[in-house]
């Protein structure tokens, strides 16, 4: 168990270099520089509403496009989340929140299960928000879920403004994650699984936890 619930990840590829420092029991302190302005804005939402202390620096081949950097930020953040959670002892495990932003309404339901899965149902009406390709929202969450071991369901209930839809999504995710990773005082430090174990992302065990 990671008693301090903190993690650092440094990921280097031929396309990107990403450094992440994540604290789960934080106050929402955020210092991020991904080279993608809109992604930075969304990471601030994640940190603020999830009460995560987040430091992130990314350098990538954004002269080509934002795809590699956006995805690798999701990968590194997911790895940091998995590492900080450790064996997931004593947490609530499940979280859900529905966040409004003006006309937009997005619901996120998640399970810190060790079983990576994403069901993504955002219908973003424009291809870009500023210079950010809106198809990259899905790629970010796929990378994060796969590398953190989250079961993640994202549903858009309403919305017509692209910025509002995506921001509501990040806020709902942040609040859901905060609920799921909080300590459950009734659990007394036990693992929230009937099997007594929750896999960490990257584990090779064939039998998954339920």
From Swiss-Prot:
Where does it reside? Cytoplasm
Query: Where does the secretion signal sit in this chain?
Result: none
Catalysed reaction(s) here are: D-erythro-1-(imidazol-4-yl)glycerol 3-phosphate = 3-(imidazol-4-yl)-2-oxopropyl phosphate + H2O
Q: One Pfam family from the UniProt entry?
A: IGPD
- State the GO CC annotations: cytoplasm
Is Methyltransferase a UniProt keyword of this protein?
no
Supply the alphabetized keyword list. Amino-acid biosynthesis, Cytoplasm, Histidine biosynthesis, Lyase
Q: Name one GO biological process term.
A: L-histidine biosynthetic process
| Pathway(s) of this molecule | Amino-acid biosynthesis; L-histidine biosynthesis; L-histidine from 5-phospho-alpha-D-ribose 1-diphosphate: step 6/9
PROSITE patterns hit by this protein: IGP_DEHYDRATASE_1, IGP_DEHYDRATASE_2
Give one GO term, molecular function aspect: imidazoleglycerol-phosphate dehydratase activity
Give the EC number(s) under which this enzyme is classified: 4.2.1.19
Q: Where is this region: Disordered?
A: 185-210
Query: What's its top-level EC category?
Result: lyase
List, alphabetically, the CDD domains matched.
Answer: IGPD
Read off the HAMAP family from this record. Answer: HisB
Q: Which family does it belong to?
A: Belongs to the imidazoleglycerol-phosphate dehydratase family.
* The protein's name: Imidazoleglycerol-phosphate dehydratase
Gene source species? Prochlorococcus marinus (strain SARG / CCMP1375 / SS120)
**Which lineage is the organism of this entry classified under, starting from the top rank?**
Bacteria, Bacillati, Cyanobacteriota, Cyanophyceae, Synechococcales
